């Protein structure tokens, strides 16, 4: 059996998937499976994949079609069908570096031990620049609250690394599947993909592989405005994520930010008993006024 599954959720991405496929074909190490989860595509994705499955490319290609439900539901489907030791997501418009599979395998063989839940590696843009901030050289592993705010010890000193930019999670599949699927709310097609990672980082050690393994496309698409629309369309999913953050975040600032968003998104979901449903009622009560203000800002920004 292969040691790694590369899984790719896809929705009408027949025009970008060939680049992902070519990057997999170029790998010297073919000890992996490529799993495409088709999230209800209406383009030529299925025919494209069927053609690739017939080619002598050196690795197994698995294909699952499902009704459109959003990226998080595609993740749930992927994890339910992965049985390799490690798994990594590569989006349908991204592709692997030339030595990614070999680099991951080599790193895992060298550093594998009990109580490891995942590896974080780097993403890079097509121009070679790393996405966000590279990890410090003295940061080898961590356990606790998320890769955005990592507390670690080096040289006998306590240090804090405040990360910017996405990082590539390479999960230990058996650990990831100990946690429940990402919640799905009726009528909503978005939930933070970080759901399982939050739980994993709390319970297991995460290794740091300070090297790019995936090339991502820079999207200058007005994402902040788009996020306002996501709040309106998927308020229950956002509320669910905020409940976790307000309970477990290590700082007052992070908890208050989560509570402010929770208030606004609860109002968008027409949940007027949000204080009773909160996992941090005191902080939520403190956040009511700014949360209501944020609610009106979101409504104004998304007014047609």
Positions of PLM-derived features:
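Short, well-formed alpha-helical segments that are part of the catalytic scaffolds
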Residues: 12-26
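A conserved acidic beta->alpha catalytic loop
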Residues: 23, 38-48, 91
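Short beta-strand/loop segment that forms part of the nucleotide-sugar
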Residues: 31-40, 62-67
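Glycine-rich, basic loop-to-helix element that forms the pyrophosphate-binding segment
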Residues: 66-82
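Short aromatic/hydrophobic "clamp" motif used to bind/position activated sugar donors
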Residues: 87
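Conserved donor NDP-sugar-binding/catalytic core segment of glycosyltransferases
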Residues: 99-135
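Conserved nucleotide-sugar donor-binding catalytic segment
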Residues: 129-225
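C-terminal subregions of glycosyltransferases and related glycan-biosynthesis enzymes
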Residues: 207-304
């Amino acid at each position: 059996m292969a040691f790694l599954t590369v899984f790719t959720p896809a929705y009408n991405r027949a025009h970008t998937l060939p680049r992902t496929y070519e990057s997999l074909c170029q790998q010297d190490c073919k000890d992996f499976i490529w799993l495409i989860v088709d999230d209800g595509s209406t383009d030529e994705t299925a025919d494209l994949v069927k053609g690739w499955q017939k080619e002598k490319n050196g690795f197994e290609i698995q294909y699952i079609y499902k009704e459109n439900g959003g990226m998080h539901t595609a993740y749930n489907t992927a994890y339910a069908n992965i049985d390799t030791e490690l798994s990594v997501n590569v989006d349908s418009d991204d592709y692997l570096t030339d030595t990614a599979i070999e680099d991951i395998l080599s790193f895992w063989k060298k550093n594998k031990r009990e109580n490891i839940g995942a590896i974080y590696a780097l993403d890079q843009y097509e121009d070679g620049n790393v996405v966000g901030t590279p990890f410090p050289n003295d940061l080898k592993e961590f356990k606790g609250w998320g890769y955005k705010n990592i507390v670690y010890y080096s040289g006998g000193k306590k240090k804090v690394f405040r990360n910017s930019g996405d990082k590539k999670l390479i999960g230990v599949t058996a650990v990831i599947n100990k946690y429940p699927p990402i919640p799905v709310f009726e009528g909503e097609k978005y939930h933070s993909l970080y759901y399982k990672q939050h739980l994993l980082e709390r319970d297991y050690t995460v290794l740091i592989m300070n090297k790019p393994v995936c090339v991502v496309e820079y999207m200058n698409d007005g994402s902040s405005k788009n996020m306002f629309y996501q709040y309106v369309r998927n308020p229950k999913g956002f509320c669910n994520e905020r409940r976790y953050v307000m309970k477990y975040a290590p700082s007052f600032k992070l908890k208050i930010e989560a509570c402010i968003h929770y208030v606004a998104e609860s109002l968008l979901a027409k949940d007027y008993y949000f204080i009773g449903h909160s996992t941090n009622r005191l902080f939520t009560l403190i956040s009511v006024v700014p949360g209501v203000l944020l609610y009106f800002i979101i409504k104004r920004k998304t007014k047609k």
